[in-house]
Amino acid sequence: MSVADIRKSAETRMAKSLETLKASLAKIRTGRAHTGILDHVQVEYYGSPVPISQVANVNLVDARTISVQPYEKSMAGPIEKAIRESDLGLNPVSMGETIRVPMPALTEERRRDLTKVVKSEGEDAKVAVRNLRREANEALKKLVKDKEISEDDERRAQDDVQKLTDRAVGDIDKMIVQKEAEIMTV
């Protein structure tokens, strides 16, 4: 494995850590409605679980209401049940062919709890990025030990990996601050 391969691998895996964080932050509810909140809710469709977005049209009605319109009328009941049983704390209301999902306002205490969850997710992502840095540095040390690269090349490569790590940690911090601001906005 070359220095370029190690750097590329670290960069790719750090980007995946950022994507994972972004996906987990998207699931955390803020006071405002957004269609992405239902992305991970699965509904039984002919015996197999599928995301709601594959069996229904999901739209925003206003800042606090999501409208779910099933492609098949028979799916209204199972979709409503899946939303109600999800861990999102939502209470869907069936209106004939359409299901309305009002977003309850977050209490101050719930907002604080959610910001703690956001910080925890961010810390987990930072730990993952730092572990990737450590793995890359260990791979570089192995190259030096096997006399494939010089110590100067190792130092330069470690500096590159450190820059990637710093950039990833900075991006994580920005995501956390942004999500906390969304949650705390009343």
Swiss-Prot record:
UniProt-listed InterPro entries: Ribosome_recyc_fac, Ribosome_recyc_fac_dom, RRF_sf
Cellular compartments annotated: Cytoplasm
CDD domains noted in UniProt: RRF
Major subcellular location class: cytoplasm
One Pfam family linked to the record: RRF
Keyword Hydrolase: no
GO function terms (MF aspect): ribosomal large subunit binding
GO terms under biological process: cytoplasmic translational termination
Source species, domain of life: Bacteria
GO annotation, cellular component aspect: cytosol
Family recorded in the similarity comment: Belongs to the RRF family.
Family matches, as NCBIfam families: frr (TIGR00496)
Protein name: Ribosome-recycling factor
Gene source species: Bordetella pertussis (strain Tohama I / ATCC BAA-589 / NCTC 13251)
Lineage of origin: Bacteria, Pseudomonadati, Pseudomonadota, Betaproteobacteria, Burkholderiales
